[in-house]
Amino acid sequence: MISSASDPFSAISSNFLCGKELNAIKVNLLKERNYPEIFDGFGWCTWNAFYKEVTSRKIYNKLDEFKEKGIKIKWLLVDDGWQQFDDRKLLSIKEDPVKFPEGLKAFTQKVKEEYGVRYVGVWHAFEGYWAGIHKDGELYKTHKDMFFETPTGWIVPGETEEKAFKFWDMQHSYLKEQGIDFVKVDNQAAASNKYDNILPGATAASILHTAVEKSVFKNFNGAMINCMGSKMENILTRPKSAISRNSDDFYPNAEHGFITHIVQNVYVSPVHNQIHHCDFDMFWTKHKTATVSAVLRAISGGPVYVSDEVGNTKAEQLKPLVTPNGDIWRFENAAMVTKELFYTDCSKAEVPLKVWNKSGDNFVVAAFGITPDKTVKGSFKLSDIPNADDKYLVHDFFSDRYFILKSGEKIDLETEYNACALYSLYKIADDNTVKIGDKTYYAEGADPNPKTVLLNDIL
């Protein structure tokens, strides 16, 4: 299918809608997927804090820090490292008793009751673990009927939907009994390769995604984060799960990691967001890119969470991002590059990378400096975003200034490397009133409780 439109976003959307109407796309489009309420709150993930050396004691230490600093987190994700594995292969569906000596159920109870964290989730791989299931482990010996041995010797979830579902339902039912509320399912793009010479890749992906989602919806009401699965055979075979990681990992020690991260996210999202709400991944609040990372997550339209090490969460970085009760304000789409930069490498072109999103009649636009060690200049016009009106009230977040922007006018931009500008655009009603959000938040344009003011009273 080929679509023609006045902007690339409309053309891409038209293609997906047409594909759905022709039954070429057999899974739900974005509007048919329900965003889990869990991820309307602020979260913390163990990954960049502990990597595979995660333990319950270390997690309690981090939660003590959040408590002392008055930071409310709504959900906690225990990432890779909590399970029993050997040689990158899964031994059991149960937690590692050395790392979680009190047991997973007692751990989740303590996290919820003593620390006030409402939801706890865990990570697991699509194949069981990175290299599948261990042949000498309790899991395989007891439940061989749920698995499939490939011609190359991998032990993976069964090659039929029924067998794969039996495995994941067993695992997820156990996790649910321990108080787990959601899962992150990782390494999805590589999974179908394990079934080479047995099933076509797209068929294998469809079987696996259908089976795992059937279990997730049975046990967790659909609350999951899909991860490492941006191949189209993954995106187009997930029946109805809502959230999918939109980029490679956040790498805190990569010298210019933010460039790669933002470019992947805002250029992939125009396609990915046709099916899924996009997860822009975690970040650190104590980091040279903390502010730009927080702004990007605030306007991303997806989950907002950090992975700070113990002692390293900077509460002041979270104040414009998270409400005191741990809520976040989400825009309705995934954040995307502005249309005139759709085919531009902003880092090499030495211009600000402009990113937009919307909430109802409001827009948000951020301009990021992503050319190393250089200050870059550019401009923003209303024509840079699709379907904008002729006039808006604009709030410049970092200078705390309100002004009017009309069609044909421009905002001059000048951004340093690892810095950004942020503008909220408010629709002006016929009676010259404007519904404005709380200007102390990056996502003010998505404030669920805006106040109505007269234009003359704010300019």
Segments the model singles out, each with a brief description of its role:
Residues M1-L30, Y35:
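Extended acidic/polar, glycine-enriched regions
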Residues F50-V54, Q83-D86, E127-I133, A190-K194, ...:
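Flexible loop/turn segments at secondary-structure boundaries
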Residues R297-S300, Y305, Y343-D390, N418, ...:
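Carbohydrate-binding surface patches
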Residues E409-L413, A421:
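Short strand-edge motifs at loop-to-beta-strand transitions and within beta-strands
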Residues E37-L199:
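Aromatic-lined carbohydrate-binding/catalytic grooves of carbohydrate-active enzymes
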Residues D186, K391-G408:
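Solvent-exposed beta-strand/loop surfaces of large extracellular or lumenal domains
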Residues I133-E177, T210-A315, M336-V337, D345:
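Glycan-recognition surfaces
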Residues L104-E114, T203-M224:
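Alpha-helix-loop-beta-strand connector modules within alpha/beta enzyme cores
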